[in-house]
Design a protein with these regions (language model features):
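Extracellular/periplasmic helix-loop junction at the C-terminal end of a transmembrane helix
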Residues: 179-196
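Secretory targeting signals
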Residues: 5, 18-71, 95-160, 172-179, ...
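Generic structural signal for small/hydrophobic residues in well-ordered secondary structure
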Residues: 10, 72, 88-90, 156, ...
Length: 238
């Protein structure tokens, strides 16, 4: 079967699963809400107004991870994957279509999230907020980071074949482990996927990565996870 019909079928699956629509809605709401709360705190002479405006992505990316995880985990319940592969025997093509079907809505919602968060942040911070040039970089970086984290989770879920296992690893990692490693060794932490991608959300940076190189590192993590997921789907029984 050609790629486009497979992609269309995977997009239909996403539109018809309420949990996935809820996860995408949570990306926007959680990111904007936590960013508004962070922006409302006192910020006299804030050295990093851009990150204050986009602070909520630290929590919004959890919803993005839940989206990517659930989209793939649904295939491993009730024999759904066997039916899918019966219709699309080319497993790498199917998994590529699944990844694209996750990336497209994640990017669209990410761009919406970036725009809403920027407008909220500038409205709350006022004159102390980021410039429009910084804000545009932050909005695009926000969209790319959310998309890449959703894809990273999707690839890991394909390897583990369990949404619960994936979330049990990634959520504590994002909320606890990443910060602990960051306190112990900033050199290592700079190259973790969540921290590398968020460099684009800072007004200035002094580490080894810049905004776009940081996103490139995050993209490498996501690509590695997706390749591992494709290998797992191709080699293991459905």
């Amino acid at each position: 079967m050609p790629f486009v019909p497979v992609l269309r079928a995977e997009l239909i699956k996403i539109r018809t699963l309420r949990s996935l629509i809820g996860a995408l809605a949570a990306v926007v709401l959680v990111t904007a809400a936590f960013s508004a709360l962070a922006s409302a705190a006192p910020h006299e002479n804030d050295p990093d107004p851009l990150f204050s405006a986009f602070f909520g992505i630290s929590f919004g990316q959890i919803a993005a991870i839940a989206f990517g995880t659930t989209a793939v985990a649904a295939e491993f319940r009730g024999g759904a994957l066997r039916l899918t592969l019966a219709a699309t025997p080319d497993r790498p093509r199917w998994f590529a279509a699944k990844a694209a079907a996750i990336a497209l809505p994640a990017l669209a919602v990410g761009l919406l999230t970036g725009a809403v968060t920027l407008l909220v942040g500038k409205a709350v911070l006022g004159a102390e907020g980021p410039t429009w040039a910084e804000g545009l970089r932050g909005a695009v970086g926000c969209a790319l980071q959310l998309t890449l984290m959703a894809l990273f989770a999707a690839g890991l879920t394909a390897v583990l074949r369990s949404g619960v296992a994936t979330l049990s690893i990634l959520i504590p990692f994002l909320l606890i482990v990443s910060f602990v490693i960051g306190d112990m060794s900033s050199g290592i932490a700079d190259f973790l996927p969540d921290r590398a991608g968020q460099v684009a959300l800072h007004s200035s940076w002094d580490g080894p990565l810049g905004p776009w190189t940081g996103l490139a590192v995050c993209a490498l993590w996501s690509a590695a996870a997706l390749l591992a997921g494709m290998w797992s789907v191709s080699r293991r029984d459905a």
